[in-house]
C-alpha cells in the first residue's frame, strides 16, 4: 500500500497531470516553441510525458496497480491541435509515423493493443472507459476552429524521436493532404516511483 507521503505527492502530481493531459496548449509564439508545428492554418502541439506525470494522473482516478505497471512499459505523448481552415481536417493517428533518430519506425500502441492488455489482466471496465477518453480518437472529422487533444502511446524509444502526421482534408477526404513533422521529442524510460514504491 502507498504510504501517506506518497499519497500527498500523488495528489499534487495528479493536479499537474490533469492540466498537462487534458488542456489544449496555447503559446504566444508557437513557431519558436519546441514541440509545436504551425502551417497550413494548423497548429499541432506534442509533448512526451514523464512516468510520474502519467502515473499520477491515472492513480488519481483510482486505477489499479496492475494497469499502472502496464503504463510504465509505454511512452505517453500528449497531442493537441486546432485548425482554422475553411474545410474539414481528418484526425487519423493510424496514418502517422513516429521515427527514432536513425529513421526506424516506432510502434504505436493503439486501442486494440490496450484492449488485449486489459482483457489479459482483467482490468476494471470503469478504468478502461476512463483510459479510452484520454486517448486521441482513431478517426474524427475536425471542423474549423474545433480543438482536439489526447494521448498516443508508443514503445519507448531510447533517444530523440519525431512525429510525422498526415491529415486528409475535405468532407470526402478529397482535398490536399497536410503533412507535417515535430522533432526532438524525448521519452523518459525509467519507471515511476509511485508504482515501484520508491517515492520519498
Question: Which residues are covered by each model-predicted region?
Answer:
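Intrinsically disordered, low-complexity peptide-like regions
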Residues: 1-2, 108
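Bacterial N-terminal signal peptides that target proteins for export
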Residues: 2-15
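Bacterial N-terminal signal peptides
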Residues: 13-23
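Conserved functional micro-motifs across diverse proteins
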Residues: 27-200
